[in-house]
Amino acid sequence: MRPPQLPEQPVGVVRAEHLTRLLRTYEGRDFTSRRDSAIILLLVDTGMRRAECVGMTLDDLDLDQRIVWVLGKGRRPRALPIGRKTAQALDRYLRVRDEHRLSHLPHLWVGRNGPMTPSGIYQVVHDRARAAGLPAMHPHQLRHAFATSWLAEGGNENELMLVAGWKSRIMVDRYTKATAVERARASHARLPPADRL
């Protein structure tokens, strides 16, 4: 006897306007604002996992080439491209980090008492979402936002697998299903059959 098949859980999608509101909560020039802004932008821009984010060191950044290195699941290293805004946010964070009392640590992300933990990254996203008046949000939702945006904008599925660090197509298929309705709607808007009659 086989267990019953459970329905596949749809991938929750963070709306673009929510991401914009989330990023607007970082207007300050203080250490925490600069750090949190860089974390959020990095998560949104790369889709990295929070464990990958928290595991980064200063040596994992190449801001001139706009590439960051992460150690993914199975301890597989990956190079992730970043955009101009993310590189700028990281540069601003590094400048205030240099003045932090824990600047001697090799860890990229530091807090009051030491290197940040996965729960610290979770707290950054959760607290900033609350400050923006948004529904509860967690770091993995930013990974979802990255993947769905990549596909919705016509990004290559094989490249997404590489950047996201997935070994199988199962995850790509989940995200493809999540964006299928939006992609069909956009295609129909470009090619409405009845409008050509």
Could you describe each region identified by the protein language model?
Residues 1-197:
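Conserved catalytic core of the tyrosine transesterase superfamily
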